[in-house]
């Protein structure tokens, strides 16, 4: 039997999603340990998209296979009670055997939140990035539109990125201000390592006036990571979740 889970987590205390063995706690390892405890047998999960250390997840989707019979609500509640308080399973649904959390997804969504004021955050320091320079969100939004469509995003991926190629389709990019907080929301078919944070880092330079609006298009065309902006800090980034065709009968928040 195959199940899909919707998982929410605060990534502050984790080295990232992926379980790499030694080196500190991961979200994946914590989830697999809790699921295995409920099943009383080892279980492994496959996720829709891995996140880095300090990055959060609002509705990460995973799937797992098991012969153990449990009600979906029992999987959800039983697993959550065994997880650290920074991770929760929001829902559990049975899915077809050919559903795949990663390969069945048609899009993925991220949001980056940035506090734009002179004084750094205290209460939300783990869920907000910070920029003391005044930023023009309209300039950032206009500049970001140059990235829409299918492009080679080599200028916006990390040097450690192991993807075979840098072509991705960015379906939407919106920059908006809500009081002192600027939000950058993106949706694409897939993302490269550090791609969202590198885009945000470059947009900040445009928003501050240090770089012209046209600079983002020049970076995209030049495909040179070394001349782009710095990688924005991880704490401002949330993986909102993937999107799937409606034939998989998943909750509305992850359905196209």
Swiss-Prot record:
Biological process (GO) annotations held by this record are: tRNA pseudouridine synthesis
Q: Which organism is it from?
A: Stenotrophomonas maltophilia (strain R551-3)
Q: What is this protein called?
A: tRNA pseudouridine synthase A
Underlying gene: truA
EC numbers listed for it are 5.4.99.12
Please tell me where substrate binds in this chain.
110
Q: Which Gene3D superfamilies match?
A: Pseudouridine synthase I, catalytic domain, C-terminal subdomain (3.30.70.660), Pseudouridine synthase I, catalytic domain, N-terminal subdomain (3.30.70.580)
Molecular function (GO) terms listed?
A: RNA binding; tRNA pseudouridine(38-40) synthase activity
Query: What keywords would UniProt list here?
Result: Isomerase, tRNA processing
- What are the top taxonomic ranks of the organism? Bacteria, Pseudomonadati, Pseudomonadota, Gammaproteobacteria, Lysobacterales
Active site (record annotation): 52
Pfam families linked to this entry:
PseudoU_synth_1
User: What reaction gets catalysed by this protein?
Assistant: uridine(38/39/40) in tRNA = pseudouridine(38/39/40) in tRNA
CDD domains, sorted:
PseudoU_synth_EcTruA (cd02570)
